[in-house]
Amino acid sequence: MTKVKVAINGYGTIGKRVADAVALQDDMEIIGIAKTRPNFETVMAKDKGFNVYTLADRVGAMEKEGIEVSGTVEEMIKAADVVVDCTPGKVGATNKDLYEKAGIKAIWQGGEAHTLTGCSFNAETNYDEALGKDFVRVVSCNTTGLCRVLSPLDKEFGVKKARVTLLRRAADPGDIKTGPINAIVPNPIKLPSHHGPDVKTVIPNIDIATTAVKLPTTLMHLHTINLELEKECTAEDVESVLAEQSRVRFVGQGITSTAEIMELAKDLGRSRGDMWENCIWNESITMYEGELYFFQAIHQESDVIPENIDAIRAMMELESDASRSIEITNKTMGI
């Protein structure tokens, strides 16, 4: 089998995880990663055997720190079939001209606007839309988490109205620059938040409004979900539908917080302690006065990683069937 050659432009929180996931696949391979600074992540990439590329004016800085560079970002892109852009939000959009000139397919992350690609992706929801596409955007961690539950519930019962409050972590664990440290911040203060419109880029028909708050924690996001459904159903009916979703994990057994979910991920032996699935407290699934309520937790560093793998497979037309691609990705990653 000829493997698809994948380049990773940006090797931070998402990029390094996507690189590791690609390396697990039988139908794709990493031809290089791009970093702009000679930090510990760059050294780790070399230790893993990845070819390191950088900007032309950064080659000297890399070599000064003893990091062998395989070439420039432009050279990496020319050698690839598809590039996964994991550069910081709003930076990735500036790379589109570079990819277009190279005639290469590209995937961006949720920090970029939907208009950049015209195709926002979630594997379980709209895999077919990305088949053969040149440019695709994998939606953010929060939007991914919402699509994973709203899509199957909409198909089964019809979602008449969705109202979601997102309790967002303030920063990733390794981020020392972002806050708040000792405050609760309505973000944004003017409602609704951007998450609802972002969900609609994947599920256009859904009526959804979202509000969001930033909290002084680094571990996960928490969603409080309230749905008005078109068909009558019980909490048990909802639980049965969600139980069939391969990227949804029910939590209980004494787990009452995001801290304990992260501990569970470590106990499962997950790489970096990642939790790729939505974590739903199935005990929270409740029908109250005809409306559905439940809580779910989203690991912001990792839930989009399997989605990037499925996006590659769809764009390169390695697999036309969404369920088959999801099955392959889940098996290789241990989901």
From Swiss-Prot:
It comes from Methanococcoides burtonii (strain DSM 6242 / NBRC 107633 / OCM 468 / ACE-M). The lineage of its organism: Archaea, Methanobacteriati, Methanobacteriota, Stenosarchaea group, Methanomicrobia. One of its GO terms (molecular function) is glyceraldehyde-3-phosphate dehydrogenase (NADP+) (phosphorylating) activity. The gene is gap. Its main location: cytoplasm. It is found in: Cytoplasm. NAD(+) binds at residues 13-14, 111, 169, 300. The active site is at 141 (nucleophile). SUPFAM superfamilies: Glyceraldehyde-3-phosphate dehydrogenase-like, C-terminal domain, NAD(P)-binding Rossmann-fold domains. It is an enzyme of class 1 (oxidoreductase). Homotetramer. GO terms for biological process: glycolytic process; lysine biosynthetic process via diaminopimelate. Pathway: Carbohydrate degradation; glycolysis; pyruvate from D-glyceraldehyde 3-phosphate: step 1/5. This is Glyceraldehyde-3-phosphate dehydrogenase. GO terms for cellular component: cytoplasm. Pfam families: DapB_N, Gp_dh_C.
